[in-house]
């Protein structure tokens, strides 16, 4: 955790908290240089040493994320354990599809919507080719970068 500076909380879920952070080593915000991302999302899991089911679920997620390297799937940068808790560091993506939909109360342009659907299908197809089923596809879990990817 020493190389990251927490900026704020992105969200909370059943297994833990997701933080927005910047990499201290770069001293920069949000610029992409040769696939190294300075802004990251850090998923901090609740203590799970007592809960065998939670541990198995978390380890399955880590294994799956290490396997799934694809442009339409958020990238896992690293995973580490500190003080009995697991941390997953992802590329940071600013918005999700739910936020995009809420920002466009009159609806999304059909061409843009087709582009979103096409990318979702590409990502899901890649998962299925790797024998992974998402099981929780919903607008807030579909991340959208500034280029609509």
Predicted regions and their residues:
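Flexible N-lobe loop architecture of eukaryotic-like protein kinase catalytic domains
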Residues: 11-14, 69-72, 82-85
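Conserved N-lobe ATP-binding subsite of Hanks-type protein kinase domains
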Residues: 17
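Conserved N-lobe beta3->alphaC-helix segment of eukaryotic protein kinase catalytic domains
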Residues: 29-40, 44-69
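A short, aromatic-enriched beta-strand patch in the conserved N-lobe beta-sheet
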Residues: 78-79
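Conserved short submotifs of the Hanks-type protein kinase catalytic core
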Residues: 84-96
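AlphaC helix of the protein kinase catalytic domain
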Residues: 98-108
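Activation segment signature within eukaryotic-like protein kinase domains
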Residues: 116-117
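Catalytic-loop of the protein kinase fold
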Residues: 128-145
């Amino acid at each position: 955790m020493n190389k990251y500076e927490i900026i704020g909380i992105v969200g909370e879920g059943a297994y833990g908290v997701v933080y927005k952070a910047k990499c201290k080593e770069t001293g920069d915000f949000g610029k992409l240089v040769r696939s190294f991302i300075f802004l990251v999302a850090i998923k901090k899991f609740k203590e799970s040493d007592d809960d065998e089911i939670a541990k198995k679920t978390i380890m399955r997620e880590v294994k799956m994320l290490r396997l799934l390297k694809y442009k339409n799937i958020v990238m896992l940068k690293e995973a580490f354990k500190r003080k009995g808790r697991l941390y997953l560091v992802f590329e940071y993506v600013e918005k999700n599809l739910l936020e995009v939909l809420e920002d466009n109360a009159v609806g999304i342009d059909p061409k843009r919507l087709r582009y979103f659907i096409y990318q979702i299908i590409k990502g899901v197809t890649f998962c299925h080719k790797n024998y992974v089923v998402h099981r929780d596809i919903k607008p807030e879990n579909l991340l959208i970068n500034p280029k609509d990817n």
